[in-house]
Amino acid sequence: MKDSDIKDIRSIDVSGLKDWVSSSGQPEYRVQQILSWLYKKRVNSLDEMTNLPQSLRESLKNSFSLDVPKLVRVQGSKDTTAKFLWEFGGGDMVESVLIPANLGDGGDQSNRKTLCVSSQVGCAYGCKFCASGLDGLKRNLNVHEIVGQIIAVENWHAEQTGDFGPIINNLVFMGMGEPLANYKNLIPALAILN
């Protein structure tokens, strides 16, 4: 199998992961362990899944990749709006924006945070108010690239604050691209995130 044929594990839905675990002769509880490593502990490498047997980790590495978006730049800070520029393999770049909520109803600071996520590299629509379409559509983001933005922002926030818990309360797909034009990857990404 060529590296280009290996699918990113974050592009596999729960059903697909169950099928893989079963076909690998592993007990069903391994599915929950793997999901916990991917989405709760937010690992950046399959080797970090230390409660899995080494043989299973090797089998995972032979079957899947785990691509992590590279943070090129962040503007803003941990307590204000932060705009992230991510690079994916191949050099394609997209942005995500972490937006803290305004003051709460009683004038207190709210802990709500919204993440604005990209779904495409560029955009085919060319709306006058938006810079995403200036160079046209380059390509749709894959499922793992959509999901990877959320995980990478959560990890960035943990590095900045020491708080490793989830911080994103709300997702909007209003970053680069038109999300429904990438329906075939958006819906599986939403299923994984849900």
Q: What positions do the PLM features span?
A:
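Flexible, acidic/Gly-rich N-terminal and inter-domain linker regions that tether
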Residues: 1-113
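Conserved Radical SAM active-site core
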Residues: 103-121, 125-194
